Structure formats: C-alpha cells, structure tokens
A protein has these predicted regions:
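Surface-exposed loop and edge beta-strand positions of immunoglobulin-like domains
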Residues: 5-7, 121
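Conserved active-site tyrosine of GNAT-family acetyltransferases
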Residues: 52, 132, 137
Length: 167
C-alpha cells in the first residue's frame, strides 16, 4: 500500500540517494571522477533542499512509502490559487508501476474539489512529460530548460465523477 509521511532529518541520506538517481543520465556526459560527481551532487542537493524549504508558503514535504519501504518523495505547495507540485520522484525500480500516476490523480482530484489549477515545472527531457500531458497538463510557459505546466480544474459531473484521464 502506498502512503505518505512527512520527511524527517533521518530521511536525508535516502533523499540524497533518490536525488542522485534522478541525475544518473548526466554523469556520463561530464566525465568527472566519482568523487567529483558526488561532491557536485551533494552541493546541488543541499541547494535544492534549502530552496524548497524557503520558497513555498504552505508546503508539504513527504516521503512516498510502499509498505515500510521509502520509494520516493512528493513535495506539494497548497495555496488558495493553486496546488503546485514542487517535486515528485521515485527510485528507478519503482518507476513506471503506476505509483506516481496514482499520486498525481489524487492531487488532480484535490484541485478539482477546490476548483483551482494544479501546476508544476518539468525539465524538457524528463520522461514524465508524457504522463503529465496524458493527465491533462498543458504547457503554459517556457522556462529555458523546463516547461511550466498547468492543469485547470475540471468540474465534477452530476454523477459525482470527475474527468481525470487515465495515463
């Protein structure tokens, strides 16, 4: 069963390992030693973590759990005008298993229920771009290396069902 729990200081190494897994494809491009790569990624991880902690009004920073096993992270900022998905990441062995899509659909329902858009940024080369588009996100801005995407709230039908596409 998939659950979420707030991050703690004890999660720092897991979160770093998760972050490293999202950057694995880049390692071959730079030609650095393992020590140089690790030092660079630790610096980047710490900067990202600090920026996330400081720059959002109503954030929730959660570890995605599969039973007792941490498998990813979901960071979301909820404010009256939008729900911003700050970050959703899964360890490689848990990707493409419907975990992320299920969590995304839950957030989209929340946006529909509150009648506010769900937004996110995604790097242009991120394979998740296709999932986001299938879930109804549309590109709403070019940020250079990333897209700003938005999914507007859709009405709840009289039957009580919402129009949330399956991926």
């Amino acid at each position: 069963m998939i659950t979420l729990r707030p991050i703690t200081d004890d999660d720092r190494e897991f979160l770093y390992r998760l972050y490293v897994s999202t950057r694995a494809a880049e390692k071959e491009l730079v030609g650095w030693t393992n020590e140089q790569w690790d030092e660079f990624l630790r610096m980047q991880f710490n900067l990202q973590h600090t920026q996330y902690m400081r720059n959002y009004e109503q954030p929730s920073f959660d570890v995605i759990m599969l039973g007792d096993t941490p498998v990813g992270r979901l960071y979301v900022n909820r404010v009256p005008v939008e729900i911003r998905i700050i970050d959703i990441s899964l360890l490689p062995e848990y990707r493409n298993r419907g975990i992320g899509a299920g969590l995304m659909r839950n957030i989209l329902r929340e946006g529909n229920d509150s009648n506010i858009p769900v937004t996110l940024h995604v790097e242009k080369n991120n394979p998740a771009l296709g999932l986001y588009q299938r879930l109804g996100f549309r590109i709403n801005g070019d940020q250079g290396v990333s897209w700003f995407m938005e999914r507007v709230a859709t009405p709840v039908f009289e039957s009580g069902r919402q129009n949330i596409p399956s991926p």
